[in-house]
Amino acid sequence: MIPGEILTDDGEHELNAGRATITLVVANTGDRPVQVGSHYHFYEVNDALAFDREAARGFRLNIAAGTAVRFEPGQTRTVELVALAGDRVVYGFQGKVMGPL
């Protein structure tokens, strides 16, 4: 075994199984690319991204940890979001929540 190595069972593994998800259409209205990481509170992403922000409160991208989604200028795409887990308390990011959801 290598230090830090994770050994898993054979077969496919479902990410975020049993967690609430939503699908949103997101458009980059800015003139620069915007990249959003896997665990960023989607409600607080760059203001150049246009979408139903209130629906995204308490959600993050439903992608593998350590990955990201890039929105090119003028691009519109559909993304799946997954509910934040744990205590559902958010601090930092753009400072729009700073407490319980």
From Swiss-Prot:
Which InterPro entries does UniProt cross-reference here? Urease_beta-like, Urease_betasu_sf, Urease_subunit
The membrane spanning regions, by residue number, are none
Describe the reaction catalysed, as an equation: urea + 2 H2O + H(+) = hydrogencarbonate + 2 NH4(+)
The question of whether Hydrolase is a record keyword is answered with yes
User: Is the Lipid biosynthesis keyword given for this protein?
Assistant: no
Its Enzyme Commission number(s) read 3.5.1.5
The record's subcellular locations are:
Cytoplasm
Molecular-function GO terms, alphabetical: urease activity
**Gene Ontology CC terms, in alphabetical order:** urease complex
Lineage, top-rank taxon, reads Bacteria
Where does the UniProt entry say this protein principally localizes? Answer: cytoplasm
Entries under Gene3D superfamilies matching the protein: Urease, beta subunit
- Subunit annotation: Heterotrimer of UreA (gamma), UreB (beta) and UreC (alpha) subunits. Three heterotrimers associate to form the active enzyme.
Q: What name does this protein carry?
A: Urease subunit beta
Q: Which organism is it from?
A: Burkholderia multivorans (strain ATCC 17616 / 249)
